[in-house]
């Protein structure tokens, strides 16, 4: 049986060479939503006239006018449809009396069809028009159990009698077909021009249902002027992408949605971006509106999941019939739950499709932080439930606040509508997408493209439309000399193109001109697979990037193969190392996201990245695989030197070849990633890397960490950073202007390299002895001082201008003249405290104290407690009462700590005494 959309389309269109539609009948345009429905016939204006869908165990074919089901000219298609709808050969084919002429068409082709007033108990095919209002429940259950339904009709005439705003949810046919995501609309379908498609036609981006949805907005926001979402949690941003989904709450930028709703089938959904919003008393007016809307005023038998006990209490207080339940039951009219389990996903989706109301809330940013390499849009439990409703929870956050309700006109912004306007604008037509929405379109589009699209025409259709848009528009040439605004159409194109490539779409035509913009334009990928061996053992407590020494060119895909044990060990593949996300930068010197990471959870995987990049295998913490062979196709070698392994001859040969644009210099403790052009003049990396290893040993020694490092630190140069001149992390990021500082042995020896060691110091900082914001940019500099003095022989006074004696003295005096206020104790002023301790007691107390902190099980979060612990422990190390010293610096000394330290000799001649005496 043809169970996939592609196979179904092929079966339905077998032998169909033309669409012979009778001209005297005007069809209705069909609206498709959800993940199951797809079009079979689409006219030249993009209107769907015949659609197919699945529901439960059964299938539907929906035709936009009942007369088409009785037209002999469509016999080839009708015969295919009936054949495809049959659950198995020989099952009964039954036709409602309203389509009696169809019986003759079927019998004329040898199909034994019978006229029956309703579908029988035996599962087969039932054919009916869309105007019957008495068989709704029976038809839905017939399909759900595995039957096939052929249904046809138009809704524009019904709308003229009952009102256009009632068509979607009250037209008889829609009460049946909507459960499978197909709606008859009151919009006339044009039948002048259409062609027979060879593959599933594209679904129109957007059908305007403003009036119906505006009425729903009004009901949900009735009597509400403000939404206060300061409810104790940080909400996620919501992505509203379904044609019948709409926003309810936006932040003050009108760009971040935290509350939304949708119609799906015969049911309704309300989504909050954090479950705390469903339990907060300040959200009470909205929650009551939501329950009324979801239940259509019935408000009986509301099921509240046990995770939302406070919501249950709130509803009981208002006399609503509700109860705490551990799971969804069939007798509920509304189900309220959090978005953190997908165990009942299918059951919830069918509950909504058949008329139930769903109130659900949750955030996905925490899940995303705990599952790097997995897409929150595809794998977060809440999104497994919600995506089909046209709503998704993004892993981005919304700053909690109190936001006014301005009854959002969804004509201003809706993802599909914005994409449609964007397409029109790029085609030099009358698109009117506001400039400020282009940034949101890029973010939303990138999110939407992370929803798994394989086998889902609704999503693949958007991919196809985007490919066409981007192919026509071309990729903007973005660089430091040619930046683009982050809220420009060019930035949106960059974001959409990036994520489209990550989704697996063929972007070769989009990327064909990329190489001409880069230094890799004269490179070609290896025709033969390359096998490299990486270390699959990671005893540490953090994931490790393992370099492959290979580079994937722009716009290319690579096939990566590993063994069965490796595929089940939690490995990931990463393309690129420039991990800063520049989405919120004012100007862009490169695309906002240029790296891609995915799970290597099968033995062979195809991976692509529009922007190319060095290839890495990420080994998870605790992994014990040992040596792992990785076979990679379609990549080029990149310059790579490993201290102690790469010979000078190998390096010279490597660097002379036409290689990837980025290379790496590595030791067991640090890896430098810089442009290949900066490595061309490096004749022998060994002395440079030996010095780097000496510096890294000093970093580890001061931090009381094992050496060699369990995970080498990484430093990567980039054309643009998300913050600062450099920033810490894994990897440490620096600007291109700092590359020479990293790779010039002479410069390091003579001038030092304060910045990189400062960032390495950040990576050693520990919560227990950090007092943010005071010491955040202070204690990291201890490593800069230590490395410069103990390894490079550069005194602190020469290592940084701020450490000249006159500068230090000036800061001390200013601090004391102000009364030593703690709020002034930051950065260089705070560093001075530690330098004075070091200059009297040496480095050893710091080293032993940092080691001791690693053994302390519990340290309070507040700064005052942490500062007193540091005071106490340091005093014990040096066997002196340091209370007078820290009091002079303005530290808040606790009485019990002062009393405990009274047994030690008091440090009265501390370095501040000379300044205090002169006041």
Swiss-Prot record:
Chief location category: membrane
Q: Does the keyword RNA-binding apply?
A: no
Check the record and name the SMART domains matching this protein: M60-like (SM01276)
Give the record's keywords alphabetically.
Cell membrane, Membrane, Transport
Q: Which GO terms describe its cellular component?
A: plasma membrane
GO BP term, example: hematopoietic progenitor cell differentiation
The similarity annotation says: Belongs to the TCAF family.
Which named protein is this?
TRPM8 channel-associated factor 2
Question: What organism is listed for this UniProt entry?
Answer: Mus musculus (Mouse)
Q: Which gene carries the instructions for this protein? A: Tcaf2
């Amino acid at each position: 049986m043809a169970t996939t959309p592609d196979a179904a389309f092929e079966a339905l269109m077998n032998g169909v060479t033309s669409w012979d539609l009778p001209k005297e009948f005007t069809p209705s345009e069909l609206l498709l939503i959800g993940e199951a429905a797809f079009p079979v016939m689409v006219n030249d204006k993009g209107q769907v006239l015949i659609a197919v869908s699945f529901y439960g165990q059964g299938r539907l074919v929906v035709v936009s006018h009942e007369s088409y089901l009785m037209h002999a000219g469509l016999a080839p298609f009708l015969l295919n449809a009936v054949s495809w709808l049959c659950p198995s050969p020989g099952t009964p084919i039954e036709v409602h009396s309203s389509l009696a002429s169809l019986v003759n068409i079927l019998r004329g082709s040898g199909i034994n069809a019978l006229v029956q007033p309703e579908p029988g108990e035996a599962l087969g095919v039932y054919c009916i028009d869309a105007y019957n209002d008495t068989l709704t429940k029976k038809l839905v259950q017939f399909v759900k159990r595995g039957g096939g339904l052929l249904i046809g009709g138009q809704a524009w005439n019904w709308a003229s009698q009952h009102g256009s705003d009632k068509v979607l949810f009250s037209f008889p046919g829609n009460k049946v077909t909507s459960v499978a995501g197909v709606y008859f609309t009151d919009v006339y379908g044009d039948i002048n021009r259409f062609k027979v498609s060879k593959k599933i036609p594209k679904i129109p981006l957007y059908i305007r249902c403003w009036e119906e949805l505006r009425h729903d907005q009004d009901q949900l926001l009735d009597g509400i002027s403000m939404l206060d979402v300061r409810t104790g949690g940080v909400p996620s941003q919501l992505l509203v992408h379904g044609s019948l989904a709409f926003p309810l709450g936006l932040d003050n930028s009108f760009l971040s949605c935290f509350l939304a709703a949708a119609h799906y089938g015969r049911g309704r959904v309300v989504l909050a971006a954090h479950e705390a919003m469903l339990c907060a008393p300040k959200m009470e007016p909205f929650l009551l509106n939501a329950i009324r809307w979801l239940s259509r005023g019935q408000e009986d038998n509301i099921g509240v999941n046990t995770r939302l006990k406070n919501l249950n209490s709130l509803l009981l207080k208002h006399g609503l019939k509700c109860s705490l339940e551990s799971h969804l039951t069939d007798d509920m009219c509304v189900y309220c739950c959090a978005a953190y389990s997908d165990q009942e996903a299918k059951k919830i989706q069918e509950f909504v499709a058949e008329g139930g109301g769903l109130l659900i809330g949750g955030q996905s940013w925490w899940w995303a932080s705990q599952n790097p390499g997995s897409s929150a849009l595809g794998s977060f439990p809440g999104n497994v439930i919600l995506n089909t409703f046209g709503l998704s929870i993004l892993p981005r956050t919304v700053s909690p606040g109190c936001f006014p309700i301005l009854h959002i006109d969804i004509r201003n912004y809706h993802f599909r509508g914005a994409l449609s306007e964007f397409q029109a604008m790029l085609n030099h037509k009358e698109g009117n997408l506001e400039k400020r929405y282009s940034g949101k379109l890029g973010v939303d589009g990138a999110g939407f493209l992370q929803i798994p699209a394989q086998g889902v025409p609704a999503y693949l259709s958007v991919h196809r439309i985007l490919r066409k848009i981007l192919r026509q528009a071309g990729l903007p040439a973005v660089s430091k000399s040619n930046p683009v605004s982050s809220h420009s159409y060019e930035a949106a194109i960059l974001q959409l193109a990036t994520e489209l490539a990550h989704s697996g779409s063929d972007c070769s035509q989009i990327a064909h001109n990329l190489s001409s913009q880069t230094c890799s334009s004269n490179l070609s990928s290896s025709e033969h697979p390359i096998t490299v061996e990486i270390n699959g053992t990671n005893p540490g407590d953090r994931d490790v990037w393992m370099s492959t020494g290979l580079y994937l060119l722009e716009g290319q895909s690579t096939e990566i193969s590993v063994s069965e044990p490796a595929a089940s060990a939690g490995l990931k593949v990463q393309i690129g190392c420039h991990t800063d996300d520049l989405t919120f930068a004012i100007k862009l010197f490169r695309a906002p996201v240029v790296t891609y990471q995915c799970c290597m959870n099968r033995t062979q995987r195809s991976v692509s990245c529009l922007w190319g990049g060095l290839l890495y295998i990420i080994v998870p913490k605790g992994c014990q695989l040992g040596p792992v062979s990785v076979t990679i196709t379609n990549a080029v070698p990149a310059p790579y030197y490993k201290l102690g392994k790469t010979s000078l001859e190998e390096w010279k040969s490597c660097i002379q070849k036409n290689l990837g644009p980025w290379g790496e210099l590595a030791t067991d403790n640090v890896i430098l990633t810089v442009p290949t052009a900066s490595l061309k003049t490096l004749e022998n990396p060994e002395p440079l890397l030996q010095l780097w290893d000496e510096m890294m040993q000093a970093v580890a020694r001061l931090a009381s960490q094992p050496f060699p490092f369990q995970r080498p630190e990484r430093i990567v140069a980039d054309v643009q950073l998300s913050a600062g001149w450099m920033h810490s992390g894994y990897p440490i990021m620096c600007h291109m202007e700092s590359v020479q500082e990293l790779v010039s042995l002479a410069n390091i020896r003579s001038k030092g390299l304060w910045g990189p060691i400062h960032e390495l110091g950040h990576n050693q900082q520990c919560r227990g002895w950090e007092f943010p914001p005071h010491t955040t940019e202070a204690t990291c500099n201890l490593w800069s001082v230590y490395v410069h003095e103990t390894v490079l022989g550069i005194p602190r006074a020469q290592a940084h201008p701020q450490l000249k004696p006159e500068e230090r003295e000036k800061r001390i005096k200013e601090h004391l003249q102000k009364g030593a206020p703690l709020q002034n104790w930051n950065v260089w002023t705070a560093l001075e405290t530690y330098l004075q301790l070091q200059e009297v007691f040496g480095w050893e107390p710091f080293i032993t104290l940092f080691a001791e902190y690693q053994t302390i099980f519990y340290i309070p979060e507040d700064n005052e407690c942490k500062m007193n612990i540091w005071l106490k422990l340091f005093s014990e190390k040096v066997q002196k009462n340091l209370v007078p010293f820290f009091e002079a610096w303005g530290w808040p000394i606790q009485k019990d700590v002062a009393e405990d330290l009274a047994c030690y000799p008091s440090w009265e001649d501390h370095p501040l005494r000379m300044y205090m005496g002169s006041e």
